[in-house]
Amino acid sequence: MPETSLYGCVRACHRARSILWIALAALSPVAATAVHAQSAAFPAKPIRVIVPFTPGGFTDLMTRAVGEPLAKNVAQPVLIDNRPGANGIIGAELLSRANPDGYTIGMVIAGHSASQTLYEKLPYHAVKSFQPISLVGVAPLILVASNSFPAKDLKELLAVARAKPGSISFASSGVGAAAHLTMELLAQQQGLTMTHVPYKGTAPALADLMGGHIQIMFDTMSAMLPQVRAGKIRAIGLSSESRWSAAQEIPTLAEAGLPGFISGSWAGLLAPGGTPRSVVDRLSGEIQKIVRQPEVRARIIDMGAEPVGNRPEEFRVFMESEVARWAKVINQAMLRLEQ
């Protein structure tokens, strides 16, 4: 799989920064002064961050990791507003309808881009209805197996799947989640037939994996690595381009036999469409500074993610590529959901 979405896109976006700054330098002194004045006046009151999932999960923790230092930097409270439901759609719709003044923003994850194709009647457009602020971090997924599953590595797993089509059941935290779609991507690329068993969250899926009721699954490093190190499940490989700094003993799927296989989840901040550019730039600039802080970087890495922090244009390109990428996987798998 080409790396044009996720990590490859992130690197390409960083290279585009120098071109963008040249364009910004062409602004007239008057225009530049006006933009600075508007952004300097923001914020004058608390900022609300909509999190479309429950407290304590990956999205919530990522939001708090940057929300706390953001409040300090802008000298205004940053209020976390958890609005879970419908795979993140309830919170995202609320964000899309919010006043576009910068005082309501939201954190979304990879499933946000997949929803554009997964749902036939989405009440917003995953990209066009929003103003991207910054990609906060990307999180590789780890492919794990039950200890009772006979395959000890990727080569053996693929051999079992090909020898007995349909014999392997894989779990996910829900239909359309990054973990589900990454397994669909693997199956499509390798011509495999496997049975998907969706759960309502990672915890019950992991419990059945450890109990031997399910053979394999993808999920985040933060959720799976403790169980791997405790010997309760077996690591097969990571969906990143290089080994994870905190788990060098686990190979990537690319080096294990799937060249170019890169996938995962991510978390990024959006504002409602129509939010003034000066306000978006102010927020984006703060987030970029925040994710470079050593303590914030360490906090994000502890969650199994890689800090990014990029500009609005870069995040928009990234989101567009993610929508297109997952549309192909979803359409080939003939997946559709109703809200």
Where are these regions (language model features)?
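Hinge/capping helix and adjacent helix->loop/strand transition within the periplasmic-binding protein
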Residues: 97-103, 117-204, 253, 266-299
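C-terminal lobe and pocket-closing loops
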Residues: 138, 152, 224-293, 321-324, ...
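Sec/Tat signal peptide C-region and signal peptidase I cleavage site
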Residues: 31-37
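N-terminal secretory signal peptides that target proteins for export/translocation
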Residues: 1-15
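An extracytoplasmic/periplasmic, membrane-proximal ligand-sensing/linker region
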Residues: 44-46, 192, 277-339
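Bacterial N-terminal signal peptides
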Residues: 17-31
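N-terminal (or domain-start) structured segment
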Residues: 37-128, 167, 175, 191-220, ...
